[in-house]
Curated annotation (Swiss-Prot):
Organism: Leishmania braziliensis
Keywords associated with the record: Dioxygenase, DNA-binding, Iron, Metal-binding, Nucleus, Oxidoreductase
Coarse class of the protein's main subcellular location: nucleus
Assembly, per entry: Monomer. Binds to DNA as a monomer.
Designated name of the protein: Thymine dioxygenase JBP1
Main EC class the enzyme belongs to: oxidoreductase
Gene name for this UniProt entry: JBP1
Amino acid sequence: MESSTKRIKMDIFNFPTIKETRTPEEVAESYAEAVKLHPFYDNAHCVIDFYDSGTIKDGRGEIIGVVLRKALPKYATSMASALLISAAVRTSLRSMIFGGESPLSGIAGYFDYRGSPVELKSRKTSFTYEHEEAWSAVFPVVDYVSEIYRHVAPERWKAQNNAIPDLVRIHGTPFSTLTINSRFRTASHTDVGDFDAGYSCIACIDGKFKGLALTFDDFRINVLMQPRDVMVFDSHHFHSNTEVEVSCSEEDWKRLTCVFYYRTALGEPSSYAEYRRRLEKSKQDPSFTPVVSNVMMKENGTNLNRPSPVHPVPPSPFWLPMLAHCLQHCASAAQSVHEAMTADGSQLAEIIFGEPLSTSDGIPLRGDDEKLKANGDTGAKPLSRLGGFSETDLMVSTAAEKRKYLDSEFLSHCISAQLLDMWKQARARWLELVGKEWKHMLTLNPERKDFLWKNRSEMNSAFFDLCEVGKQVMLGLLDKEAALPKEEQAFWTMYAVHLSAACAEELHMPHDAMSLRKLNVKLKDFNFGGTRYFKDMPPEEQQRRMERKQRIEEARRHGMTGAHEKRANWLTNDSFDYQTEDCVVDYAKHKWVLPERHAKAVTKNVHTAWLPTREEVVRVLVVLPDLQIRVEGVDCKLEKPDTVEDSSEWVRLVSSPAVHRLLAAAQRNLQLPDDVMHGNIHIRFVFHSTLPTDMYDFVVLQHVLSRIPDDVLASSYITRAAALCSGCLFVEETDVQCRQYYTLKYSIRRNYDAVAPHFFQQLHQASYGTKMARVRTKGELEALIPTVCCARYKLQGSPLNTTIHVVSPTAPH
């Protein structure tokens, strides 16, 4: 319940950022400075979106990352996320990789605090110290991740395990520290301070979102991660996150990730000196028995905190079967095609896919003026200070979602019982008096819709009393004696929305009778001018109110004592309390699978060895769409639809020289090309209505699905084609959606959507003679795939916006 309470408190004050001290110009300057050092990379930056489990290596065979899908048990991630969600708080320490804004991030476990104003170093984080009793909730997920790491990269795991001081292990693993990120899209960075000779691990432990892939920036590959996915990776390569894929700004999403690593400064001589000092001090207290009785120094290796060297791999669609674990049976054959396709001067991509892997003068990328801010989710919003809170739509809508937190059910976990009782009584009294006055108003005018507030009424005095209680509730939720302006804004907005809703729902008043503006004006009276009523009261009433205010404050402080003591104790904690939070996890009692057995099962298909060379012939079948219409001659002209008028998006699409070359070229399927023999690669061509019956290593569907408008028939065709390949299927199609779609301003998205289908349909008519091509979005294409979609490859600059989905011929077991 402690973690749940902290999560509630954090969410109450997690309102849109309102920074009165920063002008829009200052925010823009901060953003520009941050992205200059740490740029954001959109999905379109990379040529590969990797969806399945796989091993990603660089050009010299070094592992960049190993990703495993659904590799963590649900109970383990659920337990960990319930605790760790409250560790991610607004922090300016990582603002440079969030466009100059403060992201939701935090650390747990042990930390060195080198370079920090915290006086005492090399110890438990405040989060672990404050949650010591609940800390065991993270042990299962830490154990599972450690065992997966050990099975995937045993030598790296061993080196890290041998180096980490035993005092700072999390549950006996080679991890000392966890970094927890919530709704945090990181800009390009490397992780500084991790163990050079080991790897870090990242797991998504909760969320409901699309996009936000982990990108290896120098290798141009996006790794999609969803809840329960794990990746063991070299965090010294530059990495970042792609954009979140939401259709509108109001669409809700959440994402919680945890990074597991060894913070090497904890193994340096200065940290060992701190451990020994604490141990010697503890020995002076005969009543204290440390969990660890000695400090054994270990070799920590050389840690330079430099980016890993980059040995790039020239990408192609045939590189992807070499990565995917489920396609290892055809990896050597794919390697033969990949090496031939990426050789200097090779035209194999044009032969197999009908166009090159990259086109330099294709559809242009967007400028920053057309895009949303990469960290726009937390951007500064305009402040309309009309009283006690901001009346901007975003603040009010956010408060409407959070008003439930002022219900007794939630407050009972967050403030003292005495203060809660005062809140309930003051709230009930004010509502009683409002109801009494409203009933009287309706007697005078049954058609009345607006509540008339009387400043000298008993109801007004009850409102001020409720505000006094509310103020102490706010401070009790914050666990401090004074609130920041932005915290006051958040609370009073929620307070007003809560009371307005109570009048409507409990007193059955019209929705706007007790309006937010009315409450805002009265809150302004309370917060900034309420004392003018106080001075007119009789002395005995003034004394009664002063005593009442003191009792409310004492009720609030009574509930805060324990929390404040715990936090203050951490700042001054100089004890040798290493590993006091550790305990045994009884996997058998809970009927949980043992970490070693679980890791063995989820890593059984992991391949990290070099691929053998394929000597036999590699058979590739390329399927072309049947010709529907023959375009007479070449040099086709685009017909501008009547609905377009003067669309800048239409002008942008048709401005590409590559588009004009495509229109001037002959149709690609006027007749079947002859078979091609390229080294040991044999390529055969057929029309989509005459599929053969013999087997091939690979089958390529070249814009075939655009000829099949019915989704059921299109999906069935994929199944038929997949049955012809022993390796994998390549589904090549136009993605009608702009590759930067989710980064665009909403007005530009609408303008693009209005012209893109017609534009690509005309290009298909010119290229393949398709009368009315069914061009689909990425999501629509992937919904057709009945088996496993391992990855998506994007032909760069393609005038047809061509993407290639790599599909396993069989469904997962």
